[in-house]
Amino acid sequence: MSNLFEPISLGKSTIKNRFFLAPLTNTQSYADGRLSDDEYQWLTMRAKGGFAMTMTCAAHVQAVGQGFPGQLGIFSDDHLEGLTRLASGIKAENSLSIVQLHHAGMRTPGELINDRPVCPSDHSETGSRGLSTKEVEQLAEDFITAAQRAEAAGFEGVELHGAHGYILCQFLSPTINQRSDQYGGSLENRSRILMDIIAGIRERCSPDFVLGVRLSPERFDVKLAEILELSQQLMSAGSIDFLDMSLWNVFKEPAEEEFQGRSLASYFTELDRGATKLGFAGSIRTPAEAQQCLDLNVDFVMLGRAAILHHDFPDQMKNDPQFQPIKNPVSADHLRLEGLGEAFINYMSSWKGFVKD
């Protein structure tokens, strides 16, 4: 049985355990993307509570890529002061500091940017316009520049958000991506922007800068077979340090009928990962489930809701393996004690059954 409290290496970094904080929308930043005190408190409390890696929420790399109100920004040097403070605060608690780089693409609410959202191709359902080839190249450049900005702020790595139907995921979709240039058509072409971003970060950031990718294996108009192929390619190339698979439920079967009869997770754990570390996110809410996830033969577990309810989930489990987390719904006062600001509490109130009325 693997031990959740064994150290793990990510590239040239060694971290203290297998608990990673999932990147969680919290709507606590200022309207211009600058860090707020509430977001600083939310993240540094998790670092102090024993998470070996503390990852920010999705931080948008272009102003037009904002996905939700109160989103952390990393598209301007105006964000550096707050990002530097945050990186320092996380590292002070002996937690690896990671920014998730993001662009919402067609999922950008038009009213947030006062413009039409963008997409790999024109998308009538959302009213999004397709990017020109030059704009795709600029998008890749802005992801790379954001990684450099994260490193300049003192962060130890970044994760590329290629999941949940956001823009990198939109490029991977054979349905949404209808381009006829080098960024559309074959899986090789549809994943080209992701590969270009990875190559650019590796070229311009330091050799010990940690780089990961988050992918969705299903939903969002992607195909499991293609995500498996891409995952193997990423791990075989050795160009990323970790792969974060967002499964929604780590114990579920695949949605696609031809793959059913075994767990979705098993398709990824049987891949040859080389030196790349593999982790899962999805409905891991108790110490037993965290251990069961690790026992699927993954290297780390990503906690989301469990980390909202208990900032010190890893430390509590370390001190008491029988620790039982509080059950939902919880009071707003409980969430305040756990370091959530009012904007985050209001956001969580929109999740059915999470916060008491």
Write out the residue ranges for each language-model feature.
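Flavin-dependent oxidoreductase catalytic cores
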Residues: 1-357
